[in-house]
Amino acid sequence: MNREVRYFTKPDKSAQMIIRNKKCWELTQAQKDEYIQNLTSKLAALRAHADISQEDLANIIGTSRQTYYAIENRKRTMSWSTYLSLIFFYDTVENTSQMIRELGVYPMQLVERFNDVTAI
């Protein structure tokens, strides 16, 4: 299958470089798995600091309460998209924004790659 990228307007040079060099901002599956494992072990503490119920958090991130419960209790592994949803949520909560960085569950490597124009 040919996965050609098509545009309605011509992208600027930096956008073209990002598309061509997407490897510079992708994480390997092993890196993603490590971030997911680190976050999973901290979910109960983060949720307590955010003062939110499992049901409310599940609704925010787009899962059922049962699915979130299984993830928090390590009976189920979360997907990368669920991980990102949780990180984005906890980054917006004042009580947990700094905490996710200090716990090493915030993907600073990914943020640095997105922000580092020279990596592109």
Language model segments and positions:
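Short basic helix-loop element that most often maps to the first helix and adjoining turn
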Residues: 1-3, 41-57, 85, 118-119
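A short, Lys/Arg-rich alpha-helix, primarily the initiator
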Residues: 21-49
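Short alpha-helical DNA-recognition segment
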Residues: 51-70
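General nucleic-acid-binding
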Residues: 1-19, 108-110
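Short, conserved catalytic or interaction motifs in soluble domains
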Residues: 73
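DNA major-groove recognition helix of helix-turn-helix/homeodomain DNA-binding modules
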Residues: 81-102
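Short, charged recognition helix plus adjacent turn
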Residues: 95-120
